[in-house]
Every structure is written in C-alpha cells, then in structure tokens.
Amino acid sequence: MKYILQKTVQIAKKYPFSVCCIVLVWILSFYPFPEMESLEDVPFVDKWTHIAMYGGTCGVIWTEYVRRHLKLDGGKLFFYAWLLPILMSSTIELLQEYCTTYRSGEWFDLAANSTGVTIAVVYGLLFFYFKK
C-alpha cells in the first residue's frame, strides 16, 4: 500500500496537469448537470464535448510526457496515453449506467471519447516530431 501511495505522489509531481485533467474528467462525468435548452440546436453537442474532454486530457498527457522525455517509449505511451484513457472511459460509462440515476452510459459516448483520445495521439506524435 505504501508503494502505491509513493508511486501516485511521484506521478502527480511529474505530471501535475495530467492528473488534474483526469480528476476533472471524473468529476464532470458524475456531476448532475441540468439540461441546457440553449444547446439543443447544436448537432451532437454532447459528443463534441466528449471528444474535446478526452482529446484535451490526452493532449495534456502527451505534452507533459514529450516535454520530460527525449525518447518516446511506445509501449508506455500506448498503455498510458491511449489504452488506459479508453478503459477509464469505459469504466465511467458503465458506472454512469449502473450506479447513478441521473446519468446514462452510452456506446456513442465511448466512441466519442475514443475518438478524442486517438486525435490526441496524432497531436502527440506531431508535437514530438516537431519538437526536435
């Protein structure tokens, strides 16, 4: 248990903005927002929000990683900057569906989240390439 806590603190110190974004995603995912009638005219506003939220979070992860490393570790990046956010998104969607009465889990939300994460991968690779 002590090791896990130390590792968590180490990650939070090394990647503070990424950790803040991840915590913010969890909070926003379970906050009971009221319906916004003014946004009903925007097509797929919910999906665009998901893409922006996950793309932004993973963009921050990539930015912090690239700024602290001279070489890309493809395995770590695949796991921490692509797979783990998608698994987190899946977990959140399931928790929204089965553990709340005011939120619903949707497959299209998961697809939008995955799209945002994948866009961030492209951003991260371009950021690394042009950083040199």
Residue ranges and their predicted role:
Residues 1-108, 114-132:
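Bulky hydrophobic segments
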